[in-house]
Design a protein with these regions (language model features):
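Short hydrophobic beta-strand element within catalytic cores of glycosyltransferases
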Residues: 298-302
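Conserved donor-binding/catalytic core segment of Leloir-type glycosyltransferases
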Residues: 201-217, 223-227
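N-terminal subdomain of nucleotide-sugar transferases
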Residues: 1-50
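Aromatic "clamp/platform" in nucleotide-sugar-dependent glycosyltransferases that forms part
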Residues: 281
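Short alpha-helical donor nucleotide-sugar binding micro-motif in glycosyltransferases
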Residues: 260-261, 268-273
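Carbohydrate-associated surface elements
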Residues: 158, 180
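Conserved acidic donor-binding segment of nucleotide-sugar-dependent glycosyltransferases
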Residues: 318-325, 334-339
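A short helix/loop element that forms part of the nucleotide-sugar donor recognition site in Leloir-type
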Residues: 187-200
Length: 379
């Protein structure tokens, strides 16, 4: 349950903490089994009724999906020992991400609710990137899980429909439960306060990209679009990249890599920014655009994505064709050139984000868990 940007951690961890907090408020006791980074079992209790067991299973630095998959059997073995000792007998299991689904199937015969978060067959490879070593295995396991689990949760109708194309079993098992957005993103400090606190210039444009260092997040394309925009617009501007380290020798200049940041620091970054850039070609949902919209910050997204469709129809940002990088740069230029456009999109964005609450999300999850559970364990 690391912070987004640390190792392989991303928006899924943000979602899980929001869900666990909501389930706790509803009095739903929950045990979470996750990999430990150390050699001993650690237990944390972030919310009443919620226990997170960090189970050692051969953590390797730097972490990789390959090393994580190689540790699944050891993780399962040690989780069995822990579950016996703690007398954990779940009446329903919720698995998040395909490897968690593989482990959960081995650990428990209880009904399983799966949330893929991302599906391998839908991923759009980054330019020049080859097939990931785990890709064939992941596709096989994701297809098997679609057949075996009780229900599959997707975050939007768009995501469910796209997943059905590659996993037809979801036509009968799929259910849509959108995530929520934390209250703190609705109540930001003034821009001048945020910029002074973070040490950024008071004047000029600030574009923000928040994503871990994964080629599929398309950070390089976003930086190139910003550079192209700067060739045509001479006002002051900087481009912030949060969640990843920059290339060697890339320090200084108008592109600033902030490295890994705690999620608690994101509201201040959104408050300082004039626009948030979200160039990833495939997200099952995308919490960063949602947080930015709730914060009243215009977003820039590619078409052919959930947020591309929603923003095109409801506003809150600009959409560009994914195969035309010059149009990406045009969108940045349009935002830099017009305070009136930014103000209009800011108001639209808050309205677009308004339906996404943790109260609705956790109420739906509570109902789904109850409908799938078997009598027995209180957890």
């Amino acid at each position: 349950m690391e912070e987004p940007g640390e190792g392989l951690a991303g928006g899924m961890n943000v979602f899980l903490l929001g869900l666990l907090r909501g389930l706790s408020k509803r009095g739903i006791a929950t045990d979470v089994l996750t990999r430990a980074t150390g050699e001993t079992v650690e237990v944390s209790a972030p919310f009443p009724g919620v226990r997170i067991f960090h189970v050692p299973c051969g953590w390797v630095e730097p972490p990789s999906r390959e090393s994580a998959f190689a540790s699944v059997d050891l993780f399962v073995e040690r989780c069995r020992i822990l579950m016996r000792g703690e007398r954990i007998m779940p009446c329903v299991v919720s698995a998040h991400y395909w490897m968690s689904g593989v482990a959960a199937r081995k650990l428990s015969g209880a009904p399983m609710i799966l949330c893929y978060h991302t599906v391998e067959a839908r991923k759009v490879p980054a330019p020049g990137a080859g097939q990931a070593p785990l890709s064939p295995i992941r596709r096989e396991k994701e297809a098997a899980l679609a057949r075996e689990v009780s229900r599959v949760v997707c975050f939007s109708e768009y995501d469910l429909e796209e997943n059905r194309r590659v996993l037809p079993e979801l036509s009968e098992k799929g259910v849509v439960i959108p995530p929520g957005v934390d209250e703190r993103f609705w109540h930001l400090p003034p821009r001048e306060v945020a910029r002074a606190y973070l040490g950024f210039p008071q004047g000029g444009m600030i574009f923000l990209l928040a994503a871990r260092g994964d080629a599929g997040k398309n950070a390089a394309v976003a930086v190139a679009a910003f550079r192209a925009m700067r060739d045509r617009w001479k006002g002051p501007a900087i481009f912030l990249v949060a969640g990843q380290e920059g290339p060697e020798g890339a320090s200084g200049g108008d592109v600033v890599f902030l490295g890994s940041l705690p999620h608690g620091g994101m509201p201040m970054l959104y408050a300082a920014a004039d626009a948030v850039v979200c160039p990833s070609l495939y997200e099952s949902f995308g919490l960063v655009p949602l947080e930015a919209l709730a914060s009243g910050v215009p977003v820039v997204v590619p078409e052919g994505t959930y947020w591309g469709d929603r923003i095109r129809s409801q506003g809150g940002g600009l959409v560009y064709p994914r195969e035309k990088p010059d149009r990406f740069s045009d969108a940045l230029l349009a935002l830099a050139s017009s305070a009136e456009l930014r103000a209009r999109l800011s108001l639209e964005g808050a309205a677009v984000a308004a339906p996404f609450t943790w109260e609705k999300c956790t109420a739906s999850w509570a109902g789904l868990l109850a409908s799938a559970s078997t009598p027995g364990s209180p957890r």
